[in-house]
Amino acid sequence: MGGCSSAFAVSTRMIRFSRGRVPAAILPVTSNDEPCCSCSPENNNKNNDGGGGGCDGGEHQKGKSWRRWQYRRCGGGGGGGGGRKNAILGDAADVKTAAGFAERYRLGAELGRGEFGVTRRCSDAATGEALACKTIRRKRLRRCRGDAEDVRREVEILRRISALGAGADSVVRLRDACEDSDGVHLVMELCEGGELFDRIFARGHYTERAAAKLARTIVGVVQLCHENGVMHRDLKPENFLFANKSEDSPLKAIDFGLSVFFKPGERFTQVVGSTYYMAPEVLNRSYGPEADVWSAGVILYILLCGVPPFWGDNDEKTVTAILQGGINFQREPWPKVSPHAKDLVSKMLDPDPSTRLTAKEVLEHPWLKNADRAPNVSLGEIVRSRLMQFSAMNKFKKKALGVVAKNLPVEEMDKYTQMFHKMDKDNSGNLTLEDLKLGLQINGHPVPETEIEMLLEAGDIDGNGTLDCEEFVTVLLHIKKMSNEEYLPKAFKFFDKDGNGFIEMEELMDALGDELGPTEQVVKDIIRDIDTDKDGRISYQEFESMMISGSDWRNASRRYSKANFSSLSRKLCKGNS
């Protein structure tokens, strides 16, 4: 597989550790950078577009990795010990002691582990029902108020949707939200049926009718959210799992960590999500629930042809493609796709949110309304093979990033927070260009103003010309994680079992086998896309290039030399250690 689909597979961003943010440096400059309130009316949260943290816990399923918590405003709750005054959920917790939790649930085998927590199989002590428990470890929560607010919001959203009963069967159910001295435990419905794309290529015969049925479920989730005042903001195939392995298993949405409450007419400015699925208005920092329909339209496009409608080999090129628009219905298999399907895709990917179909209107479109009568002719092997490689490449990167996450010590995160406060002399909560220059000069490490401006441009998410704690720490963590010689080599060695300095086909098949069961051809395709010198194996340099391409903050340095950017990071760390 080459061309568009190869670039798509290689550059798909793994954002588990930088939760869905596009560097400000690649976004268009707008005048809409003032934060909008996305508060929940119930908790009176004044968090200014507040989603963007939450816990991913590996989406509580095997093979998933925990996403990195985003920094918010610093200097408040969320960390600390187990006393009630340091509570994260507070009165929102169903169980408030370790003894109470142990009495109600029995923890079992680990399903996934990441930078900020662990997901385990668990069971109801009274009934034996199999469940999943996502534990957000207290010691891993940063000392920023937003972390606790994000957890509470995710819990509140899941509770609101779970309370709908049978009407919310397409959303994973939250059973309990518990808190003890160790952290927060979210006990949820266990989904063991696998990812959306895995099910598609496992069946062997994939048709437009099958795509229509899946799309109807996905858009149904969007409609359910919008009816209940919730905007999802991170719709993508990886956030949907099958409940079980049966042929008629329901498909369920499983991740609401970026979701927010909204009111009619409310506009949001925070750029969150996954780049391939972002609507133009999200990139232009003025959006509402219509953006979810766009994301669902991107998923539908991929379901029908195996590649995204707008793509690039890095975030900058992808953003440019999205803003330029234009849908390609010429390449295979589009000539054999029905006119009704193409009509719906076009209307969901309308660049104007005011004329884009609503979720309700999408469900009333003839193609989805009559999904059971959509063409039952195979879309062709090319679609299945594209989806298969996309899924396999994702899992390769997830495994590698999981190793990176495990090797990032808590103390390093704390160090960056303390660094921010030392440099924030006026306690404004923001670092200006002068703050950064002065902070380095005082510590005997003067840095050219152009390099300071580079850091500001790369890290300034909201475009206000300063770095808040979240922005400052996020960019430094990513620079350090991806440039520090300690982390990526450990991830490489995880795959290079024989230690010969190369990842070979057998090693990659063994590493991915438990989760994917990939065919030899799929693994060959992955290696071919990464193997730039065409020797049939992956060197460390090629592995590093794969990990860097298309990834959040690592691409923030694309306009500058990597050496200069890393040098600035080292000076900042050394000057404030």
Swiss-Prot record:
Keyword Cell wall biogenesis/degradation: no
Cited PROSITE patterns: EF_HAND_1, EF_HAND_2, PROTEIN_KINASE_ATP, PROTEIN_KINASE_DOM, PROTEIN_KINASE_ST
SMART domains: EFh, S_TKc
Binding annotation for Ca(2+) 2: 460, 462, 464, 466, 471
Pfam families: EF-hand_7, Pkinase
Membrane-protein topology: Lipid-anchor
Region (Autoinhibitory domain): 374-404
GO molecular function annotation: ATP binding; calcium ion binding; calcium-dependent protein serine/threonine kinase activity; calcium/calmodulin-dependent protein kinase activity; calmodulin binding; protein serine kinase activity
Residues covered by the Protein kinase domain: 105-368
Keywords assigned: ATP-binding, Calcium, Kinase, Lipoprotein, Membrane, Metal-binding, Myristate, Nucleotide-binding, Repeat, Serine/threonine-protein kinase, Transferase
Protein localization: Membrane
A Gene Ontology term for the protein's cellular component: plasma membrane
Ranges of residues in domain EF-hand: 411-446, 447-482, 483-518, 520-553
Lipidation (N-myristoyl glycine): 2
Binding site residues for Ca(2+) 3: 496, 498, 500, 507
Listed EC numbers: 2.7.11.1
GO biological process: intracellular signal transduction
Active site: 234
Biological function: May play a role in signal transduction pathways that involve calcium as a second messenger.
Family: Belongs to the protein kinase superfamily. Ser/Thr protein kinase family. CDPK subfamily.
Protein name per Swiss-Prot or TrEMBL: Calcium-dependent protein kinase 22
Organismal lineage: Eukaryota, Viridiplantae, Streptophyta, Embryophyta, Tracheophyta
